[in-house]
Structure formats: C-alpha cells, structure tokens
Amino acid sequence: MSCCKTIKLVKSPVRGDGYIIDDITNKSISFMENSDSPFFTLITYNTPHSPMQVPDSFFENIEVNLQGRYADKENKIKTQAALAMVENIDYNVGKVINSLKKNNKYENTIIIFFSDNGPNGNRWNLEMKERKGSTNEGGVRVPFFIQWPKKIKSGLVVEQITSVMDVFPSLIDLMNFDSKNNFDGISFKKYLSNPTLIDNDRKIFSYWGQRISVRDNNFILDHNDSLYDLKNDLSQTKPVNNKFSSNYLSLKKSKDDWINDVISNYDNSQRRAFTVNYDESTYTHLPARDADFTGDLTRSSIHANDSFIENWTSEEDYIYWNVNSLNSGMNKVSLYYTLPETSSGTQLTLEFMDNKIKKDIMIPHNPTLEGMKEDRIKRIESYTKDFKKITFGDLFFEKGESILKLKTSKLKGKKSIDFWLLVLEKTE
C-alpha cells in the first residue's frame, strides 16, 4: 500500500535560513502542514554536536549544575553549549507538536524521539561508563520516547531493551501493514500494551573500532569480556563474572557466535563503490568527504564530514572515487570549487573508463573561511567557505565499476582548486 510522498535527492546543496535546527524544523512543519495524505517525516537534528554553535538566547540561560564521573576532563563552556543545544531542540520539538495540534493531526500521529549515541564530550551522563565512541552503556544507551495519543497509553515505561533496528519493524507493526520481509530488528509493539513484559533471550550487540559488547535485559559483557550487573551497577564499576558465571557464559557464547557470523565476513578495508545511474535517482552527490586522493593533497580536517580537499600544487596529484555505474548513460556534471586569482585558467579533467571531459576554470573565487566567529570553543572539524558552482560538462558513464578521477591537467599559477563537491545529473 502506498501512503506517503517521496522526496528525491535535491539537485544542489541549499543555503539555509538561520540556525540549522530552527530551519530544519520550519521546513518540516511546512511539509507536514501541506500534506493532505498520511506522511512520514524524519527530522534529523545534528545537535548537540560540535562545532559548538548555538544562539545567545539559549546559551546565556544555561547553568551547568551537574558534573559527570569524568568531571576532571570536562570543558564547562562546551557543556554549556551542548545543554543550550538541547534546550533549542526542546523548543523546536514543541513547535512541531504545536503545529500538529493546530492542524488536528496530533492525535493520530506517531511521534518518536531518540538520539544516535552517547555525548560527544565529557559531561554528565547518568554516571554511565564512558561516552560516544565507546561500546559501554555511556556510549550507546540513549533516551527513547514514543507517543501516539490515539493508540498508546501515556506514561508507560517499557522495561525491555530495544535497539534502533527495532524502529522500522515496530512502525510497520503499529500501522498493521503486511510485510513478508525479514527485518534485523524486532517489533516492540507488544511491549506498548504490556510494558513489564520481558524477553530474556533478546541480546543487543554494539561494535565500534574492534570493540564489541553484548547485553541482555540485566547484564552487559564489555569488549574486555568483563560482566556487569546493570540493574545494580549501571556505572559498570564491579565485574561479576564469578558471581553470575552462567550469565557470563551465555553472553560470551552469544558474543563469539556473533563475531563468527558477522565480523568474520566483514572486511573494513573494502569500501563499497559509489553507485551512479541508479534507475530511481536522477542525482548523485560525490563530496570531498568520501573521496580519496594522491600525492600532497590534503583534507581540510582529519574529520572528513563537510571537509574539502586542498593543497593541490601538482599536475601529478588527483582526486578519485571508486564508482559503480549501474547502467550506461550520460551525466551532466557540476563542480563546487574555490580558486585564487593567480590560478585563473587552470584546466581540470574528469575521466571514467575511456571517457573524459575537460574544463578551464576561468573565474577565480577565493573567499575566506567561515564559522570560527560563531563557535563557542575552537572546533576540531573543518571550517567551511562559500564554494562556487560551475557546469563542468557532460560525461558518459559506461556500465560497470571503475575509478572516477578528477585531475589538474594544466596548472596555472602555484595552486589548483580547493574541491568540495561533484554533482552528477542523469540526462538519459
């Protein structure tokens, strides 16, 4: 059954209007208010997270009163900014709910609120062990709220552990959709009517950076195979391997089986190719974030997200992506760049298999970096700048997998472009 509008990938990056969380909220509200049929809206707030930018009206009203177990490592200004971001999220979630109420959609709308991982800094975290990047509770346990005024009783606290993988099958189940698919997750619908029901056989695995933990409803076995009783020791301070040996052996076997079943078939060194010419998509974005490069080229930050590639001083160096063209077809290519005035006339070449196109970059564009003025503390991510878009040309992609290369074929001056993004638009 079809229920929802489909929003396709946009042709080009868009410039937002004000603080990003406010802007995302306003755009989401506009979409929902103008939806006459049932809709699904995924509102992906990117806070609290660095860079620590938040409006003064929220930042100045925050006092940091709670300290976590790693208080000696805490940056109070960063914590203040993070808490201000949470206040801003709360404000914007309120706007969404008020809009649903105003438009008589609230009672029959399922609203889910949750986060992706633990805090990205050392701050109060319910005394749980560690933070984002850890497979202990402090790194992976997050709040989860669900409401459906028309169907779910308010005030329930579900005791059963669940995973983000459970959200999709649960929504399918709640809406009584028929599905013959085998999901990785498990529907939690039954717990919403019986919140004290427990499945003692359910286990959740967390894997990050070669560290693996597994937990059931009462215990966690961490990456060092230390067992903790989470009902009585949420902070994971006292291993209980000997006291609860049967629980230890059960979780250890589950962990070993999972490693053999999943990790043994997982090769982190093999990166999947980026797909082009997919039947259901007109546009493909290939950002610097996902590119590889050679020679003296560098990334603007060790953190790839929203970075750009710079220090292009040699015709021998190039930027590349492993690309799988699912079908043969022509693509219109757009490129986002900056270039100093002294390098005007630099020629770029883009090639895939036996096909290539060239472009002389005649218009210099060399803006300054942005972002530092609004940061509450010095960021670890890349600063950004206003990259210029040009039409590069039309490139034919043969069906198959190969390397897409962006080269400086003629360097004028001492420095080629700083590169941010390629956009491919399927034209046939």
What are the residue ranges of the model-derived segments?
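Loop/turn elements at helix/coil->beta-strand transitions in domains of secreted/extracellular proteins
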Residues: 35-41, 105-111, 199-201, 216-219
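C-terminal cap/loop subdomain of S1 sulfatases and analogous C-terminal strand-loop tails that border
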Residues: 119-124, 132-135, 156, 160-232, ...
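Extracytoplasmic
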Residues: 248, 252-428
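Formylglycine-dependent
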Residues: 1-39, 45-54, 68, 72-74, ...
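Beta-strand elements within well-structured catalytic alpha/beta cores of enzymes
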Residues: 39-44, 86-89, 93-96, 110-115, ...
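A short beta-strand-to-alpha-helix junction
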Residues: 14-24, 76-91, 105, 129-144, ...
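Histidine-centered active-site microenvironments of extracellular/periplasmic hydrolases
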Residues: 51-56, 60-62, 98-151, 163
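A long, amphipathic alpha-helix that forms part
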Residues: 25-32, 65-108
